[in-house]
């Protein structure tokens, strides 16, 4: 059995799915129900992915997922894209395009929602703050310079300290 989890279906993350499905016909492809192509305009930005299995959890809600000895937690983290999820377990937090090393994903593409992104960032900060600081955050892109490099990953301790969005994110009504 081969399994592929999708954080979201923007073309830069999902372009290879048809070829993967052809090459590995038994591939299980997991994604959030809301990540299905949202509109005609969205077809330019999103790639249709025929998920074999979906989650339908509410924004910010975590779902435990297991396959063999692999146990992960999927959190519905919309904002950058509908149905965006983050995945964590086994010492890794895969942020997709919710978070990068020092910044966060954009919300100006079709399906982007700044308010949902803000809520997802607040929830991500809560989750990251409860995980070991030596775990690794893997961003969906390597955009940010950190300590003279553009790293593939950053420790959760460093991302909590140096990510501008996490350092300053609040929801209206919070102190």
Residue ranges and their predicted role:
Residues 76, 81-172:
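Metallo-beta-lactamase
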Residues 15, 72, 111-112:
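Residue-level signal for the nucleotide or nucleotide-sugar donor/cofactor binding architecture
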Residues 1-2, 95:
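Beta-strand-loop-alpha-helix segment that lines the small-molecule cofactor/substrate pocket
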Residues 41, 74-76:
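Active-site-adjacent C-terminal substructures of enzyme catalytic domains
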Residues 4-68, 162:
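Active-site HxH/HxHxD metal-binding segment of metal-dependent hydrolases
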Residues 63-73, 88-91:
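Beta-strand-turn-beta hairpins that frame and shape the catalytic cleft
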């Amino acid at each position: 059995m081969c399994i592929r989890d999708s954080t979201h279906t923007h073309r830069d993350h999902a372009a290879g799915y048809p070829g993967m499905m052809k090459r590995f016909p038994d591939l299980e492809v997991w994604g959030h129900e809301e990540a299905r192509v949202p509109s005609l305009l969205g077809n330019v930005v999103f790639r249709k992915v025929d998920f074999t299995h979906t989650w339908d959890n509410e924004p910010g809600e975590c779902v435990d997922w297991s396959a063999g000895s692999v146990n992960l937690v999927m959190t519905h983290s919309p904002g950058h894209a509908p149905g965006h999820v983050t995945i964590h377990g086994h010492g890794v937090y895969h942020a997709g395009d919710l978070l990068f090393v020092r910044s966060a994903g954009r919300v100006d593409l079709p399906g982007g929602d700044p308010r949902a992104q803000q809520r997802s960032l607040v929830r991500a900060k809560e989750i990251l703050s409860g995980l070991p600081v030596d775990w690794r955050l893997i961003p969906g892109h390597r955009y940010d310079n950190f300590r003279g490099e553009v790293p593939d990953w950053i420790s959760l301790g460093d991302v909590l300290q140096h990510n501008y969005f996490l350092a300053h994110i609040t929801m209206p009504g919070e102190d």
